């Protein structure tokens, strides 16, 4: 397992674009006998993924918002250090919904795995998982938690630096009016000024931005604007 961590660390140092990094991650997973890999970045309630999991599973996971149900994500949020997991071995203590989740994942060759979660900036979390179709991961020795966190920390930095386009992410959208108003916010306009420029009532601007803030589950226009820019919605 330490050899795998070394390979991951070496990969993050290779020059190249996001495509090269994704290919390298897939090669590492395959070389060590795993079904696939998944990097998740979770900030507040927003989640993005860089993964080679089956397309249908990725779509189902995000459409159904499975991150709120996923026992691996729940454990990663609370544990913040490397751990192995198995849907079969954990079955007796799982809820009916969690068992159904693992059963669906198993249809795509995801039955067990190793996950390394780390804390990242501004209260966010990143986690890297290698998934297996085996019912459990055989570990001949304990995984070095420090080395694992260091490897995933470097991976997170590399993905952030390259601004890799996510393989999947939770749905995010703005209607035309919301996008227009946020573009004005982004260049420093107040809601009163936006109302004047767009020739609408102040209350129309306020209500539209409040609707968008509620949908994105944020509490300030600054946060909403930052998310919209990050998601390339404006």
UniProtKB/Swiss-Prot annotation:
The keyword Nuclease does not apply. It holds the Pfam family Autoind_bind. Residues 167-232 form the HTH luxR-type domain. InterPro entries: Sig_transdc_resp-reg_C-effctor (IPR016032), TF_LuxR_autoind-bd_dom (IPR005143), TF_LuxR_autoind-bd_dom_sf (IPR036693), Tscrpt_reg_LuxR_C (IPR000792), WH-like_DNA-bd_sf (IPR036388). Keywords: Activator, Conjugation, DNA-binding, Plasmid, Quorum sensing, Transcription, Transcription regulation. GO terms for molecular function: DNA binding. The keyword Transcription applies. Residues 191-210 bind DNA. CDD domains: LuxR_C_like (cd06170). It comes from the Bacteria. One of its GO terms (biological process) is regulation of DNA-templated transcription. Positive regulation of conjugal transfer of Ti plasmids. Belongs to the autoinducer-regulated transcriptional regulatory protein family. This is Transcriptional activator protein TraR. It comes from Agrobacterium vitis (Rhizobium vitis). The gene is traR.
